[in-house]
C-alpha cells in the first residue's frame, strides 16, 4: 500500500508548564510493548469532527491527566500546524491504518493547580508515569520520529514559558 497518499490525523498537543517553568510529560502505558520503552510525551490527541483545536486540547488534557479547565491558563497557540510522519513499522498499524501521521495544533498552557490535582488514572488511561521536566531536554526523552516536531514547538514556546 502507498501510505504517502493517506491524510494526516488532526490533533491538538499541549505543552503544560508549571510555575517553575518545567513541562509535564507522561510515559505511555503501551511504551513497554514498543521499541521505545523509555519514551515520554506531552499530552496530545485527536480533534473530533466539528471540534475546534482549543476545545480538543482542553478535552485531551482532562482525559489524559485529570486536569480540569479552571486549573490551566492558555498562554499561546502555535503559529502553524506541525506535521510528523509515522515510522514505517507503525504505518497501517495504528489509527486503524487511516493516517500517515499527525497534523498538530499546539497550545502552551500554564498549570495553576497543585501536583495532587493531576491524576493519570483516568477513565481511559494513557500514561503509567508522569513528571515535570526541563523543557530543553524534551527532544532527548521522546520517540525519535517526533523530535523535530518537539524542537519546533520548543523554539516557538520556550520564550513564553
Language-model region placement:
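NUDIX/MutT-family hydrolases
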Residues: 103-113, 117-149
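Active-site-adjacent beta-strand/loop module that shapes the phosphate/pyrophosphate-binding cleft
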Residues: 78-117, 131
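Conserved Nudix-box catalytic region and its N-terminal flanking loop in Nudix hydrolases
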Residues: 19-70, 75-77
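Acidic, metal-coordinating catalytic segment for phosphate/diphosphate chemistry
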Residues: 1-15, 19-20, 28, 96-97
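A generic structural micro-feature
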Residues: 6-8, 36-39, 97-103, 124
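C-terminal alpha-helix
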Residues: 152-160
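Short, hydrophobic/aromatic-rich beta-strand segments within well-structured domains
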Residues: 13-15, 24-26, 105-109
Amino acid at each position: 500500500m502507498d501510505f504517502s497518499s493517506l491524510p494526516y490525523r488532526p490533533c491538538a498537543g499541549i505543552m503544560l508548564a508549571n510555575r517553575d517553568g518545567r513541562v509535564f510529560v507522561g510515559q505511555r502505558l503501551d511504551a513497554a510493548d514498543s521499541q521505545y520503552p523509555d519514551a515520554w510525551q506531552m499530552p496530545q490527541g485527536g480533534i473530533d469532527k466539528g471540534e475546534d483545536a482549543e476545545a480538543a486540547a482542553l478535552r485531551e488534557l482532562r482525559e489524559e491527566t485529570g486536569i480540569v479547565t479552571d486549573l490551566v491558563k492558555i498562554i499561546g497557540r502555535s503559529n502553524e500546524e506541525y506535521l510528523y510522519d509515522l515510522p514505517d513499522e507503525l504505518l497501517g498499524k495504528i489509527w486503524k491504518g487511516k493516517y500517515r501521521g499527525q497534523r498538530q495544533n499546539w497550545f502552551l498552557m500554564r498549570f495553576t493547580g497543585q501536583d495532587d490535582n493531576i491524576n493519570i488514572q483516568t477513565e481511559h488511561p494513557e500514561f503509567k508515569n508522569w513528571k515535570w521536566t526541563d523543557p530543553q531536554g524534551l527532544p532527548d526523552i521522546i520517540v525519535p520520529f517526533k523530535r523535530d516536531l518537539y524542537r519546533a514547538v520548543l523554539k516557538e514556546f520556550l520564550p513564553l514559558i
